Amino acid sequence: MKRPDYRTLQALDAVIRERGFERAAQKLCITQSAVSQRIKQLENMFGQPLLVRTVPPRPTEQGQKLLALLRQVELLEEEWLGDEQTGSTPLLLSLAVNADSLATWLLPALAPVLADSPIRLNLQVEDETRTQERLRRGEVVGAVSIQHQALPSCLVDKLGALDYLFVSSKPFAEKYFPNGVTRSALLKAPVVAFDHLDDMHQAFLQQNFDLPPGSVPCHIVNSSEAFVQLARQGTTCCMIPHLQIEKELTSGELIDLTPGLFQRRMLYWHRFAPESRMMRKVTDALLDYGHKVLRQD
């Protein structure tokens, strides 16, 4: 059985995290040549490349598996060392989360853990359709995803759903939808997407108004909070989680353009198995809070 030296795994991890050999060497306080030698040693052990030497470097499929192994070992070390780590560097927890969860329920859910435990969060924001891939690649130890099926050697639990409403300001609705939200009116009304892969509004408009993808003008803005601001200032109509705009809907600052029509995204919490004590705390906090504020039906 091949048993890698974890110093070599840490070198591989550093090259990926620091996006290059030079910064990885600085992070590890060794020479760049030593980093290269450690990775070469690891590649010789497994008889295949573990890095695609692009800019920035990225792991091969086998490299991803080894990084996932390293994440698990780091968490299990925390489990075994327990109180002996008191006063040492806080444990780094890298989690992949979607922007809308981060803007609504995730931080309040994690607040008790952050208050009571010596951890450093590294929250990597990704679309909920792609967060699980970061777990697969070993970049994170947990992920909030819409995928319901667990990866090999991982656990999954249902968190609950975010319901997305198609909203705008009242002046925007009066300008673009004087006769109601119709297919022809939507062709002229600007919407907003998080990035070029964000297809939520396209799916909603296609399903309910038979509008093909790309048929409406669309801004690209990488911020959930900015969606709310754009809608409030009358710039766009957009899909926003109901949980994020309860006050604006109650006050009338924003209006639901299509009452009874919405997009539901069920969210799941994925993480490596077995769970360390710290990850169990994170899991309990996310599930407890998620079950309170997210839709469970």
UniProtKB/Swiss-Prot annotation:
Occurrences of domain HTH lysR-type (ranges): 4-60
Keyword terms of this UniProt record: DNA-binding, Transcription, Transcription regulation
Coiled-coil portions: none
Signal peptide, first to last residue: none
Physiological role: Controls the transcription of genes involved in arginine and lysine metabolism.
InterPro entries reported for this sequence: ArgP, ArgP_gammaproteobact, LTTR, LysR_subst-bd, Tscrpt_reg_HTH_LysR, WH-like_DNA-bd_sf, WH_DNA-bd_sf
DNA-binding residues: 21-40
Name by which UniProt lists this protein: HTH-type transcriptional regulator ArgP
Upper classification of the organism: Bacteria, Pseudomonadati, Pseudomonadota, Gammaproteobacteria, Enterobacterales
Subunit relationships: Homodimer.
Molecular function via GO: DNA binding; DNA-binding transcription factor activity
Similarity remark: Belongs to the LysR transcriptional regulatory family.
Source domain of life: Bacteria
